[in-house]
Amino acid sequence: YINHVSASPITFTDSGISSNVTTAMVSRYGSSINSYSEYKDFLFGFEGRTNPGISQTYLPINLSQGLFREAEDLHSVIDNFIPPSSLRVIEVAGWGLDTIASFEYYPRTVGCSGQGAGCISYLLDQRPRFTVDGDKTVVVPSAHYMNFRGNAERYWVNLEEHNNELFVDLRRNREHKDIFEVNQVNSFITSVIKKEDLVFDTVLKDTMPVDTKNRFRLSVHSPVTLSAYDINGNHTG
């Protein structure tokens, strides 16, 4: 998978003056993970990090190499499956919803308790990076994995278009977990089973949709309350 996607699943940044928080990561992997071997090294913590405490949920753990090998053994079998030419393989991916595509690890600036206002220290933190090429859970390249091998048909379900079709108060919120609630998906399955011609529209497509909208994403650290008001005093938050 990593060898087929254009964006790295993990990136790193450091401060102008070495923070000693991500410095070892940048030294070992550069600014991003670009290969499967680097990906494994990061998961195992080969840059030298130690396992965090139970309460430090914001820090990356070091995966068990034994369990990882078991997972690799499984994938060496299922990932190399090649369907017979008599079998029609179809992959349908949800598209248009903000989906986590990668994580950036960076040194977050924090104050130094009891050492004066000018003191600065750093804490390892991460921020998710989003893509619209997904259904809020699975990114399109993963949903279309079989096509990497050149033996599967690809289709897209524009969930953003589907969810915004109705009036504001009646809009839907279909995503990965309930993609089969989309009428076009059910009609598509029916047509495949009956060997009928496939019908495409603004929701079900045989080419990848193009995102032409500006998107606003806001990230904050808890505890915090977000509120928004319009000119009529309507409130959400």
Give residue ranges: language-model regions.
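Extracellular glycoprotein-like low-complexity segments
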Residues: 200-237
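Helical cap/lid subdomain of alpha/beta-hydrolase-fold lipid enzymes
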Residues: 1-201
